[in-house]
């Protein structure tokens, strides 16, 4: 038997369900009820207009808002961290709240650190992260209106971004690294419990996307 539940529907005091402790507890619930399959909606980024997991600016990157704040290495949420209504999701305020925290943490990383090598050694991932930086710079304008030399990825473009927009680049590298790190831990735990995770893909990838 199986059950469909997107992580955003899990309980969380930070405004939106995530792939942290509540997700591990849900795996325990599935094991206890002899449920073998956990089906998810796509885990990619969503547009800031529709918030649909099927409409994404990237088919490869993870949704940073699914990152559990309590499981970020060397970060402890303070008692002053805002808590949200547990019965509904205010996407815009949640995104603003989490992005502020992610940005502050990300500025302390060194993108030359070997821990980021695997992520950045993948040219497709690197190109999609570059797209997100440019998307932020252009204020969500469609890529066809960008400067010509920004419309097509190249290693030279990435190097320019690394020099001129390092703060934004750090933000997106950190959030993607942390998403995939936490997601790998959850998948490993589910495998140990013999719970199969059945995923999905963003079948309506936006025109205004890295793809």
Locate predicted features.
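Acidic/aromatic-lined carbohydrate-recognition and catalytic surfaces
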Residues: 1-211
């Amino acid at each position: 038997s199986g059950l469909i539940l997107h992580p955003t529907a899990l309980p969380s005091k930070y405004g939106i369900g995530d792939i942290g402790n509540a997700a591990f507890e849900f795996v325990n619930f599935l094991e206890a009820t002899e449920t073998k399959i956990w089906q998810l909606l796509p885990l990619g980024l969503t547009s800031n207009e529709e918030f649909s997991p099927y409409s994404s600016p990237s088919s490869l990157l993870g949704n940073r808002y699914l990152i559990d704040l309590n499981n970020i290495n060397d970060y402890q949420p303070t008692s002053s961290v805002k808590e949200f209504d547990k019965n509904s999701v205010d996407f815009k305020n949640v995104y603003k709240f989490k992005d502020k925290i992610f940005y502050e943490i990300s500025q302390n990383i060194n993108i030359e650190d070997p821990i980021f090598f695997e992520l950045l050694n993948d040219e497709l991932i690197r190109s999609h992260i570059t797209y997100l930086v440019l998307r932020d710079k252009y204020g969500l304008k469609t890529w066809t209106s960008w400067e010509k030399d920004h419309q097509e990825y190249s290693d030279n473009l990435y190097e320019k971004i690394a020099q001129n927009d390092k703060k934004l680049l750090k933000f997106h590298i950190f959030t993607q690294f942390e998403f995939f790190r936490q997601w790998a831990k959850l998948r490993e735990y589910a495998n140990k419990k013999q719970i199969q995770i059945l995923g999905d893909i963003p079948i309506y990838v936006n025109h205004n996307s890295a793809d």
